[in-house]
Amino acid sequence: MQEIENLHQSVLLQEVLQAFTPLEEGVLVDCTLGLGGHSKALLSQKPHLKLIGIDKDKFAQEIAKERLKAFEGRYNLLSGGFAKRFKEALEIHGDRIKGVLVDLGVSSLQLDDDNRGFNFHSHALDMRMDLESDLNAQKVINSYPVIALEKIFRDYGEIKEYKKIAHKIAERRAKKPFKDAKDLSDFLSSFSKNKKIHPATLVFQAVRIEVNSELEELKEFLQCARNLNGAILCVISFHSLEDGLVKNAFKDYAKNCICDPLSFQCTCSNNHALGAILTKKPITPSPEEIKNNRRSRSAKMRVFQFKP
């Protein structure tokens, strides 16, 4: 267990604790429990807080359960997609939910496990958060039509040469299907000219998002979160697609006027804001945190306070 403590560094931990400073009691929902780092710190700091932890990865959840042993009776852990499980929690606990945390990053345990397919040297081509899911990265890369690959590379990877990459993958798999993540990574490196980032980075991002329906789940969650009352919502994202969805949702939550934009005059009473955005600009890791945990470098945290 000490090895896990050393391996896993929760991103923006102090900033998360700061965001939830007003919370003293009630229920906090950690929608992406992972290895339980944020949850453990919050339960330690707030003795009257109850926690609901959600995660697709049952293996990670078992580790989190062990780490949270000292808080037995103060938490419940749920398996499954966080959008669906959060909706269920909100239906049951309602206004008792005082805080919601979403950390959209992949855990170090998943990234470093060569059997999971998240890193460039993996012996698998998987990328599933939920190991019971049918769709994995191998199916996407080896069997998706070229037009579908183009779409996910364009929309989820924001890759400029999405057509070229999709066609090259199709040409290669016709001769020899990709067997693992290293095979795919090496192939992409053989013809990519991008020197700023690893040639496989954006392709892996796009495939991972497709395999886990990450953006669809985030959209569903953000829609459901509108029903929170008096709660603090804290979301940590790791790429522009996620951050854009969160930023726009928070702006929408904070709108006073909900009239048609084509209207010349407000007729809605101009008091429909669900709360206030607490972060004018996203909070990012300090240089010291990035130095200690390079994987935190792209993290952005936004916080919203819902009205009671």
UniProtKB/Swiss-Prot annotation:
Specifically methylates the N4 position of cytidine in position 1402 (C1402) of 16S rRNA. It comes from the Bacteria. Belongs to the methyltransferase superfamily. RsmH family. Gene3D superfamilies: Putative methyltransferase TM0872, insert domain, Vaccinia Virus protein VP39. It is found in: Cytoplasm. Its EC number is 2.1.1.199. GO terms for cellular component: cytoplasm. InterPro entries: RsmH, SAM-dep_MeTrfase_MraW_recog, SAM-dependent_MTases_sf. It catalyses: cytidine(1402) in 16S rRNA + S-adenosyl-L-methionine = N(4)-methylcytidine(1402) in 16S rRNA + S-adenosyl-L-homocysteine + H(+). Keywords: Cytoplasm, Methyltransferase, rRNA processing, S-adenosyl-L-methionine, Transferase. It comes from Helicobacter pylori (strain G27). S-adenosyl-L-methionine binds at residues 36-38, 55, 86, 103, 110. This is Ribosomal RNA small subunit methyltransferase H. One of its GO terms (biological process) is rRNA base methylation. GO terms for molecular function: rRNA (cytosine-N4-)-methyltransferase activity. NCBIfam families: 16S rRNA (cytosine(1402)-N(4))-methyltransferase RsmH. Transmembrane segments: none annotated. It is an enzyme of class 2 (transferase).
